[in-house]
């Protein structure tokens, strides 16, 4: 199974870039990983920005891709349940599992409809920039859980 992360907007902060690089490298020891940064909308109304970003995101998906949208209103899973979710897709023949992190406008209704699952990393709200290394760390943690390695206590 291939993992893919799609996010809107460039990663700006050096510490976020460092976290993305660190955890991407760790994940690639377990699963192939691709990260795509899509252009975000800067000068649009809320609805127009969501629509444009949503169209751009959906064009990136293959028909068989399983889309997981990260949203503060999504379902929360603990790390073990998140690992089980990834393992279920890995073991059931999912060819591509795509995690999408929206921009500051959030997701359009079309993206939400296409998503097989909507997840929240926390009940707290984080910037879409900060979610990037947090998601990658949780994916890495899931890989170690699935391989019975001691990273997760």
From Swiss-Prot:
InterPro entries: Alpha/beta_knot_MTases, RlmH-like, tRNA_m1G_MTases_N. GO terms for molecular function: rRNA (pseudouridine-N3-)-methyltransferase activity. The keyword Transmembrane helix does not apply. Keywords: Cytoplasm, Methyltransferase, rRNA processing, S-adenosyl-L-methionine, Transferase. Belongs to the RNA methyltransferase RlmH family. It catalyses: pseudouridine(1915) in 23S rRNA + S-adenosyl-L-methionine = N(3)-methylpseudouridine(1915) in 23S rRNA + S-adenosyl-L-homocysteine + H(+). It comes from Trichlorobacter lovleyi (strain ATCC BAA-1151 / DSM 17278 / SZ). GO terms for cellular component: cytoplasm. It holds the Pfam family SPOUT_MTase. Gene3D superfamilies: 3.40.1280.10. It comes from the Bacteria. SUPFAM superfamilies: alpha/beta knot. Specifically methylates the pseudouridine at position 1915 (m3Psi1915) in 23S rRNA. S-adenosyl-L-methionine binds at residues 70, 102, 121-126. Homodimer. This is Ribosomal RNA large subunit methyltransferase H.
């Amino acid at each position: 199974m291939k993992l893919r992360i799609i996010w809107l907007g460039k990663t700006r902060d050096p510490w976020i870039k460092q976290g993305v690089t660190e955890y991407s490298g760790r994940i690639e020891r377990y699963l192939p990983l691709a990260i795509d940064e899509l252009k975000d909308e800067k000068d649009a109304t809320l609805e127009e920005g969501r629509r444009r970003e949503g169209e751009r995101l959906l064009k990136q998906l293959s028909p068989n891709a399983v889309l997981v949208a990260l949203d503060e209103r999504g379902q929360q899973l603990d790390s073990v349940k998140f690992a089980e979710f990834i393992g279920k897709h890995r073991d059931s023949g999912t060819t591509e599992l795509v995690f999408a992190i929206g921009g500051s406008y959030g997701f359009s209704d079309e993206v939400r409809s296409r998503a097989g699952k909507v997840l929240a990393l926390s009940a707290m709200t984080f910037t879409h920039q900060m979610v990037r290394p947090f998601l990658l760390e949780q994916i890495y943690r899931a890989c170690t859980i699935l391989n019975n390695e001691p990273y997760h206590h």
